[in-house]
Regions:
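Transmembrane-helix bundle of Major Facilitator Superfamily
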Residues: 2-147
Length: 147
């Protein structure tokens, strides 16, 4: 078995590439996937998004993830440099997954359900920003300079 660094097997780079690609795919898709399902979401929580008082819910449900990701990505990149990129990436994966699962378990309706979904989208944004901030650095660390 050949190694790039002492204690790191050669196939580590391919595992790192696969895992970071999956994480980035999830985080990127999640930034816009809600747009497709908005009619079903608002039907499910029995809320009309086009009523003036409910437009805020619509906007935050769409933009909450992207705002949090844009704000936090640089911070989590630096935190990953200080405490370990893989640790931050794995933590981001866990936070993102917990936010996704919690959002899928919304059983109530009305404005409270919309606020809960917005909060879970923000949690997903925190996890997604950890994924985005550290995935490229993990790949850079895993592959030798000549590849």
């Amino acid at each position: 078995m050949t190694t790039i660094e002492p204690g790191r097997p050669d196939h580590y780079k391919w595992i790192a590439l696969t895992n970071t690609t999956i994480g980035m795919l999830m985080a990127t898709i999640d930034s816009s996937i809600v747009l497709i399902s908005l009619p079903a979401i608002f039907r499910g929580i029995r809320l009309n998004p086009l009523v003036t008082t409910n437009t805020t819910y619509l906007l935050w449900l769409l933009m909450g993830y992207m705002v949090v990701t844009a704000v936090m990505v640089v911070t989590f990149g630096r935190v990953g440099d200080m405490f370990g990129r893989v640790k931050m990436y794995n933590l981001g994966f866990a936070i993102f997954t917990i936010g996704s699962l919690a959002a899928s378990l919304t059983y109530f309706d009305g404005p409270d359900a919309a606020l809960f979904l917005i909060a879970m989208r923000i949690v997903q944004g925190v996890g997604g920003s950890m994924l985005m901030a550290n995935s490229t650095a993990i790949i850079t660390d895993a592959f030798p300079e000549d590849e």
